[in-house]
């Protein structure tokens, strides 16, 4: 099984969730073993997608350094992971990725337009060898060894609309596109004013965010799935784990997880060299793992 990049360059435009300004995005092919690289054209600054370059996880996953930052990368990263893309350059002319419709389906469409190209180098994956867990009170995220990678996610909100939701996701590109990619980000009406006073969520609207009041959803079209909230958290988690640089072959379990806990989990994994093995998918090894790329 070979590493993948894009077959051609594709461009798009969307609104930034936090600043509310139009953002141009370009996805470009990269050579083998390059990984996922973000480039801010307005700063002439590159940022490799990796846990060590994460500087903030409060409202989104943010890459950066003293030169600047790129926020809200997780939806795009999630789509890139689902499509099995190993090497891609993401060019942005602003400090965040566009929110599109609040899900990752627009990025999936961009990747469909670009197509994929095989590179003459074996694909590598990260196989989890022992359990790694991060907790914050009763909240936790965990990776464990498995023969059938899944994501088991539970959320619990003190809100009548959301309440407690669980979803078990078995990884495949087809399953992702059908059941995860269209799940939108969500927020609470009571938080909007506070966020905007901090110059955040300025681009948020009913066109790119599910807005929840105490006992109703404000979006006139309603939900795309009855459990769209937990499905979106899975979308986010896939994007956050992609920062490890490989498709992760392990069971991910979360209760009330977050970008912050996901980031701490990726750091814990990389700290313990016995916790994982990087497996090159040569002809002799790919059979055991190829299902996850179906």
UniProtKB/Swiss-Prot annotation:
Stored SUPFAM superfamilies: Ribosomal protein S5 domain 2-like
Binding site for Zn(2+): 75, 232, 236
Active site: 259
Catalytic activity: a UDP-3-O-[(3R)-3-hydroxyacyl]-N-acetyl-alpha-D-glucosamine + H2O = a UDP-3-O-[(3R)-3-hydroxyacyl]-alpha-D-glucosamine + acetate
Pathway field: Glycolipid biosynthesis; lipid IV(A) biosynthesis; lipid IV(A) from (3R)-3-hydroxytetradecanoyl-[acyl-carrier-protein] and UDP-N-acetyl-alpha-D-glucosamine: step 2/6
Keyword Lipid metabolism tagged: yes
Principal EC category: hydrolase
PANTHER family hit by this protein: UDP-3-O-ACYL-N-ACETYLGLUCOSAMINE DEACETYLASE 1, MITOCHONDRIAL-RELATED
Membership in a protein family: Belongs to the LpxC family.
Name of protein: UDP-3-O-acyl-N-acetylglucosamine deacetylase
